[in-house]
Swiss-Prot record:
Biased composition (Low complexity): 242-252, 321-338
Domain of life: Eukaryota
Function: RNA-binding component of the cleavage and polyadenylation factor (CPF) complex, which plays a key role in polyadenylation-dependent pre-mRNA 3'-end formation and cooperates with cleavage factors including the CFIA complex and NAB4/CFIB. Negative regulator of poly(A) synthesis. Component of the APT complex, which may be involved in polyadenylation-independent transcript 3'-end formation. REF2 is required for 3'-end formation of snoRNAs.
Protein name in UniProt: RNA end formation protein 2
Extra remark: Present with 7450 molecules/cell in log phase SD medium.
Compartments reported by the entry: Nucleus
UniProt keyword terms in alphabetical order: mRNA processing, Nucleus, RNA-binding
Record field: compositional bias (Basic and acidic residues): 206-222
Region (Disordered): 187-254, 260-279, 321-344
Entry keyword Kinase: no
Subunit and interaction comment: Interacts with FIR1. Component of the cleavage and polyadenylation factor (CPF) complex, which is composed of PTI1, SYC1, SSU72, GLC7, MPE1, REF2, PFS2, PTA1, YSH1/BRR5, SWD2, CFT2/YDH1, YTH1, CFT1/YHH1, FIP1 and PAP1. Component of the APT complex, which is a subcomplex of CPF, and is composed of PTI1, SYC1, SSU72, GLC7, REF2, PTA1 and SWD2.
């Protein structure tokens, strides 16, 4: 007979099973923590309120079960009392947990209500502890008179607001304390608010200033990394910048335009600072159709480009272009005596150590990588492990590499780390095969070059790799078995072959006639017919 089912219990306002499970899990977590945060305490309050509301509504909905009216069974009473006791049990546990943890979460000097504690001690606590302390002060009405008479309390609370600017809950608690003490209601309310605004603005300004200083430091570091390129005075002489320059530079430019280079004038031009940049002539890359450019003499040979100083060549080309654009009738002719100072100037420019060549060499530059190397000390490392001495084994770094990664091609997989090994392996003794019957050892085995001699009539391709078998082998009729030479000495060595398939001990017909153990064929004895009586 089945148990009666409760039918008159109203559970429309009862808590869901998922909510009860969540409360149970959170209570386990709350018991593990020594201190509870404000979020955890708020969650406990929420659970207490929901359980209290659910319990009150559940009792109202089931008053007929409380009165034990007609048609109320024992199953209904049992379910109602069980749910009610569960709600009460959870309520008592949560209230007790909140009382214990809230007592532990308060600061150790919770009873201290002095201005010195507000100014010096309270900022040292964590934000949660400060909030709990202030909340306890708000609830403790006996200390309100003493706090309202303190002169520097407002400034201390404002400093706490500035300290916990990012925590909104703490700021609300601080403002609530000032409100309960009456600092924001009387004539002092405007002063406290203005002071608080100033402090908060100054704290935000300090944060912004610190961020700006960090950005400036980053910009300075970036500027230091950039290389400053100084332009050449001969090439970058504009009309605006030419007026404040000295007369010596203008006269040298005029003499360069006229093309009259003397030895004394060459010495004066050598004193001018040469630019760190070099320019190459790309005349060798011009097309053959540019015949008019060759007539003007701007196209130079490759030998001149690499022998003559490129700065002087570019200056000369600029002078020729400017003179031709200025007057079409005038022509420029450089005398033969101008070649000597040019050669001297190129020699000096080549010898100058500040000038860096931009010509690429054919050989690529290899970056040197300096690796850290240590001395090979045999007493450096001590290794502990299985099959090693109890006092450990001292090895060098190279031996340690060998231990950690011993498998390399062409090297043995096992190395003897020390001479006095506690475990000595015994050599394999195969003499028992000669003493016992060899038929007992004819079985399927895998020996790749092992000590047992393998004699089988299976081709080598099938012994090494069984993927060459036809998948339709088991569908065909079995072939004729291989005949053994029984007169020969075939049983002196075991016949070893590899079976295939899911089962390693298949029948001969399923193996396609491959032998792995010689089974003698038992023929039926031909007895004389039984006499009929």
């Amino acid at each position: 007979m089945s148990a009666p089912v409760p039918q008159l219990v109203n559970i429309s306002h009862a808590l869901q099973a998922s909510t009860i499970q969540q409360i149970r899990l959170d209570m386990v977590d709350f018991n593990k923590d020594c201190k509870l945060s404000s979020i955890q305490l708020a969650r406990i309050d929420k659970y207490i309120d929901s359980l209290q509301a659910a319990l009150n509504q559940f009792t109202k909905d089931n008053l007929h079960i409380e009165r034990k009216e007609k048609n109320v069974t024992e199953a209904d009473i049992q379910l109602y009392s069980g749910l009610k006791s569960m709600y009460l049990d959870y309520l008592n546990q949560l209230i007790k947990l909140k009382h214990e943890k809230q007592h532990h979460s308060t600061p150790p000097i919770a009873n201290d209500v002095s201005l010195d504690f507000f100014v010096n001690q309270l900022p040292k606590f964590s934000p949660e502890e400060r909030k709990n302390y202030i909340d306890n002060l708000i609830l403790n009405k006996n200390s309100h008179n003493r706090l309202s008479k303190m002169d520097g309390l407002v400034d201390a609370v404002i400093n706490l607001c500035v300290l916990d600017t990012s925590v909104a809950e703490n700021v609300r608690s601080y403002m609530k304390l000032l409100d309960t003490l009456g600092f924001q209601k009387g004539s002092n309310s405007t002063g406290t608010k203005a002071n608080l605004k100033k402090k908060l603005a100054s704290s935000k300004a300090k944060i912004k200033d610190s961020e700006k200083e960090k950005e400036k430091e980053k910009d300075k570091s970036k500027v230091k990394m950039k290389t400053k390129l100084k332009p050449s005075p001969l090439l970058n002489n504009d009309d605006k910048n030419s007026s404040p320059s000295p007369t010596a530079s203008t006269s040298s430019m005029k003499k360069l335009k006229s093309g009259l280079f003397n030895k004394n004038e060459a010495k004066s031009t050598e004193s001018l600072p040469t630019s760190s940049k070099k320019k190459l002539s790309f005349s060798k890359y011009l097309n053959k159709d540019d015949a008019d450019m060759t007539k003007l003499g701007t196209k130079r040979s490759i030998d001149v480009d690499f022998k003559v100083n490129p700065e002087a060549s570019t200056v000369a080309s600029n002078i020729i272009s400017s003179s031709t654009s200025g007057s079409s009738t005038t022509t420029v002719a450089t005398p033969a005596s101008s070649e000597e100072p040019l050669k001297k100037k190129t020699k000096i420019s080549v010898q100058d150590s500040n000038v860096q060549s931009i010509l690429r060499n054919g050989k690529p530059k290899k970056a040197r990588i300096s690796s850290i190397k240590f001395l090979d000390d045999s007493q450096l490392i001590k290794v502990y492990g299985d099959d090693l001495p109890n006092q450990g084994l001292q090895v060098s770094p190279t031996q340690l590499k060998k231990i950690l990664k011993p498998f390399k091609e062409g090297e043995p997989k096992e190395i003897i780390l020390f001479e006095d090994m506690s475990i000595k392996l015994k050599p394999l003794d195969l003499m028992f095969l000669k003493n016992t019957n060899s038929d007992d050892y004819m079985d399927i085995s895998e020996t790749k070059g092992g000590p047992i001699h393998c004699e089988t009539r299976t081709p080598l391709i099938y012994r090494k790799n069984f993927n060459h078998f036809n998948p339709d082998l088991n569908k065909r009729p079995p072939r004729e078995p291989i005949e053994f030479d029984l007169n020969g000495n075939t049983n002196s060595t075991p016949t070893i072959a590899k079976a295939f398939g899911k089962n390693s001990l298949l029948l001969r017909k399923d193996r396609g006639g491959l032998p792995y153990k010689h089974v003698p064929i038992v023929k039926r004895n031909k007895y004389p017919p039984r006499p009929v009586h």
